[in-house]
């Protein structure tokens, strides 16, 4: 509908001798007295046209032409807003599109022929996934689903580092716990991994090898076994949340020598040096960001010879460009806020278009019970573990709670609320709307022999009450909500929208008798219910949650 209104406005502008701008904004007024849709086009063009905004709005409105069955009237409000009032018949007839398109409703070909990569989770295999990583995982998965709904060919990638000091400490931790299983007295350093999962890995080693590895001083075997065990645990946790990846990129590749005799990391250093952005002092190699107006340069290679996080991150992003991704989406935790701008600047210097990169930063998560901050894990040395949260509230509640607040906002995860079986719980409220419709349709089949073939679009003209029209109009918003969520990388917009649809449906269900209504009205209201169920299903699919048929 919004596209239709925009096209009409463009024609009206041309008829008025005004070149239409590239973007025309159509919004839904919060107050229904100002119509079903509104545009500020006269306000945005007034200065350019050297006219009073309200006068310009009247001129544009006079040139607007619509098919008679679509727009009932237009009005001018305030300083120059043009408001559109749709005909009730058009709203309800348009609902047919929802069921005609079914699972495809809301999908577009916007990204057809374009490749997108979404990197998310990317936790190194040093321990179980934490709740904080879980929020980023759900956010990334939903963003990937949104992009796929718009026709993009999406690669879901997990970037990890199985080298470096932390992996060495992991291997040492497992070896010491293994020796403990062998009956040796050990001194376990405070600097090593304290989690019970280390003892679990060591116990499995002992169960398989007995004391055979006691004399093994090399850490490679312990490291490999620990990495395999932890990665299996990570993948299992993600699977529980319906999260998967298409590829796993090992940072180790960035240290391997290529055909030109240099590694990707070395090539980045050479290219930045050639551009004049490398300095060597204090025994380290620096990215000269002071030339970019920053207070300090940023270290790329430490005096120990070990690279900082920035160097492989830059090299890794170069591979994304080389793999011809037109959309590069990074889902990071708040701890990356200070680092990623340097990566963007380096890529710009290297000649890559930074506009192809979009970064979604998700803020921290705290879990609360009865208003008190709690730690989900009871196991020694473990932070708040994602598995423990899933065990407590379930996968659907975990996913939806992670994204029901803006990614830019700190999330207070109310564990008790997530477990409630009442409308206070937004997850229950959403899923109950779907289950309620399923139960209604089943009852209609049993009591009145209802089948979907009974429904004709002409019956929808019988629906004109405010509750019916508001629900019908909301269903038609679904494609635009998806587009907005994609532009903003904000699945929360989907959650808000679906909650609004559920709210409207529950109200419609209470105020508009369905099975007891006259036959034609009954069928029309069942039609509207089925369309609502379809929108909820399509939205749930993008958000990665189930659509229960009974609750």
From Swiss-Prot:
Record-stated family: Belongs to the class-I aminoacyl-tRNA synthetase family.
Stated name of the protein: Arginine--tRNA ligase
Motif mapping: 'HIGH' region: 123-133
Reactions performed catalytically: tRNA(Arg) + L-arginine + ATP = L-arginyl-tRNA(Arg) + AMP + diphosphate
E.C. numbers: 6.1.1.19
Gene3D superfamilies xrefs: Arginyl tRNA synthetase N-terminal domain, HUPs, Isoleucyl-tRNA Synthetase, Domain 1
Localization (cell): Cytoplasm
Assembly with partners or alone: Monomer.
